[in-house]
Amino acid sequence: MTTQSLEAEAKALNDRLEGLDLAGRLALVAGLEGRAVFTTSLGIEDQVITAALGSNRLDIEVATLKTGRLFNETVALIEATEEAYDILIKRYYPEKADIEDYVAQYGMNGFYESVEARHACCGVRKLRPLARALEGASYWITGLRRGQSGNRAATPYAEADLERGLIKINPLADWDIDVIRAHVAAEAIPVNPLHGRGYPSIGCEPCTRAIKPGEPERAGRWWWENDEKRECGLHVAEAASSIIPNASSAA
């Protein structure tokens, strides 16, 4: 598919998704021609989407990135969620050789020392496994919301991911955190207990801290960096090709 046609399809799909509720948005994507993959980090937004997929028995793959540095609470939630909704969450892991190369160059916790080292860690633990998860996919469903950070304030319902050659679907783009929490409570959706301990956004354990009152939702991610647009590379335009070598071809 050409860049122009991918962007045109994304725009048309964005318009169709806007007037639908969550179940309707996911059902629309499930009915499209082509493979759809939802990648979950087991955060509260992703649990809302997983619950909707499981409850409505929609034919959309669910995948997660087992980075090797996740909180124990996150790991435990994977199996609990599978049992709750009778679904399979496919695990994607970093390659052993990639981890060994990273540790040899930067050290096990070298990501604290520089942005370059942190990007390299995200590259081997997240971006390369993500490329395998999305291989051959036409649609990538995420839990991105406009309220998560200033960097995500303009998140559409559908957007062309030109680097990966697919359309990214953000069915919760217009949901704020209060709506998310109310929905979770009403539907008794299982969530990570860390959310109740001051962690609204949860990534790898060494790179996530609880936030302080009044801080943005994602302030606890890579908190030692000064850049206000801190991201791991999964959801930014520069991401894969600038963070890991040959990532574009891998995706």
Swiss-Prot record:
Gene3D superfamilies: HUPs. Its EC number is 1.8.4.10. Binds 1 [4Fe-4S] cluster per subunit. The active site is at residue 232. SUPFAM superfamilies: Adenine nucleotide alpha hydrolases-like. Keywords: Cytoplasm, Iron, Iron-sulfur, Metal-binding, Oxidoreductase. Pathway: Sulfur metabolism; hydrogen sulfide biosynthesis; sulfite from sulfate. CDD domains: PAPS_reductase (cd23945). [4Fe-4S] cluster binds at residues 121-122, 204, 207. Its cofactor is [4Fe-4S] cluster. GO terms for cellular component: cytoplasm. HAMAP family: CysH (MF_00063). Catalyzes the formation of sulfite from adenosine 5'-phosphosulfate (APS) using thioredoxin as an electron donor. Belongs to the PAPS reductase family. CysH subfamily. This is Adenosine 5'-phosphosulfate reductase.
